[in-house]
Curated annotation (Swiss-Prot):
It comes from the Archaea. It comes from Methanosarcina mazei (strain ATCC BAA-159 / DSM 3647 / Goe1 / Go1 / JCM 11833 / OCM 88) (Methanosarcina frisia). This is Adenosylcobinamide amidohydrolase. The gene is cbiZ. Disulfide bonds: none annotated. One of its GO terms (molecular function) is adenosylcobinamide hydrolase activity. The keyword Hydrolase applies.
Length: 200
């Protein structure tokens, strides 16, 4: 896996099995995952077409999954451990309608070990739980914003991480599992650090 920031877009390149809750999301095998900054006034006629066009502009011509955020990439948090690399942008100027004022929290988790289908989807739940906990611990009275999204992926040809020792995929990603605990730690750390940098 390689990643860089180009024109306020985080671009992650590799060979991934992934699932996304973002625009044009779903389950896919992709070569690129990206998180693009857009203006706070962002309101295109077709967000789905916009994200496809922006991918092309960034030189992404093959299969990809992408997210959008109003958060500047200078606030991007990258957290790596033996299990995964987490990429997190956090802002709370767009909170859920049933709570206060709002932003966007985007979470991208790239596992170094193969994930079962159960773990791939379960990691979304664990990351979302951790996001809510981070906000509550920061003193907010809401659990997220109305534009939040999560991408969970694993590298199909990775030979690093726990898989290299056990030669087995990670079966589950619930918050009580070792992998789930790592997700929780990374997400809480990344969200808190990102918000603090923005003075939120």
């Amino acid at each position: 896996m390689q990643y860089h920031i180009k024109d306020q877009t985080l671009i992650i390149k590799g060979d991934f099995e992934a699932v996304s809750t973002g625009l044009n999301g779903g389950r896919a095998r992709v070569e690129y995952i990206f998180n693009k900054q857009v203006p706070r006034t962002f309101n295109p006629p077709s967000p789905e077409e916009f994200i496809r066009e922006e991918a092309r502009k960034d030189g992404i011509e093959t299969a990809s999954l992408g997210l959008l955020t109003a958060v500047n990439m200078e606030y991007l948090q990258v957290i790596e451990d033996d299990y995964m690399t987490a990429f997190i942008t956090a802002g709370v100027s767009n909170c859920s309608e049933f709570r206060a004022k709002a932003g966007t929290i985007n979470i991208i988790l790239v596992s170094k070990a193969r994930l079962s289908e159960t773990a791939l989807f379960g990691a979304i739940i664990t990351a979302t739980e951790a996001k809510g906990l981070a906000l509550l611990e920061k003193g907010y009275n809401f659990l997220g914003t109305n534009t939040d999204a999560v991408i969970v992926a694993y590298e199909t040809c990775s030979d690093s991480g726990p898989k290299s020792k056990t030669n087995q995929e990670i079966p589950y990603a619930g918050s009580s599992t070792e992998f789930g605990k790592k997700i929780t730690e990374a997400v809480i750390k990344g969200i808190k650090a990102g918000l603090e940098l923005r003075g939120e």
